Amino acid sequence: MKALIIDDEPLARNELTYLLNEIGGFEEINEAENVKETLEALLINQYDIIFLDVNLMDENGIELGAKIQKMKEPPAIIFATAHDQYAVQAFELNATDYILKPFGQKRIEQAVNKVRATKAKDDNSASAIANDMSANFDQSLPVEIDDKIHMLKQQNIIGIGTHNGITTIHTTNHKYETTEPLNRYEKRLNPAYFIRIHRSYIINTKHIKEVQQWFNYTYMVILTNGVKMQVGRSFMKDFKASIGLL
């Protein structure tokens, strides 16, 4: 699992990081001390669990938690604070737990186990849905170039872009150029993984390496092969939803 600790006190962040490492089972544990760092972290990573203090320097933690819950796939939120008077508000936000400082390892582990149990159930359901969606789409994409038809496995397709009448299909080990329009391929791609981010670009969300803020309040997507593709302004809402920011 991936965890994000949001607290403006370095000692509290260090203590939680230490306890989570002692509990184990975390692929990544990151920290943020304010709203800006939190939003940047959520843009880059999809977290399973967030430890959130109520009193932050620039915003109330309850208000920040409400914003996080509006994400398409919000992480589990565990409020970790020295104040007990916000517990009712926290649970109204469907918080997984509410832990008071000073932290104890057993109490933290109890909260983490709640998240793990819920995640295991959700993963099983999501896997079943993804399998159903995939069953309705071909696993390969036929690409005709000259006198050959290349059958490209969809999971190996990183992204597709078009420029000056040439459509380039980037895969994990090669790139293919054709004069077929982007729309022709878009209809054949599995929407569980592929999304159009620009009138000239389609990407496989499983191959997003990094997302950077770009001009005019848009994003630049860096794919796993290093190729960069800009998100068009009219595609921003769908893109943010696809990576869990709405």
Curated annotation (Swiss-Prot):
- Changes after translation: Phosphorylated and dephosphorylated by LytS.
Q: Where in the cell is it found?
A: Cytoplasm
Cysteines paired by S-S bonds: none
InterPro entries the UniProt entry points to:
CheY-like_superfamily, LytR-like, LytTR_DNA-bd_dom, Sig_transdc_resp-reg_receiver
On this chain, the residues bearing 4-aspartylphosphate are 53
Describe its partners and assembly state: Homodimer; when phosphorylated.
Q: What is this protein called?
A: Transcriptional regulatory protein LytR
Q: Which organism is it from?
A: Staphylococcus aureus (strain MSSA476)
Instruction: Please spell out the taxonomic lineage of the organism that makes this protein.
Output: Bacteria, Bacillati, Bacillota, Bacilli, Bacillales
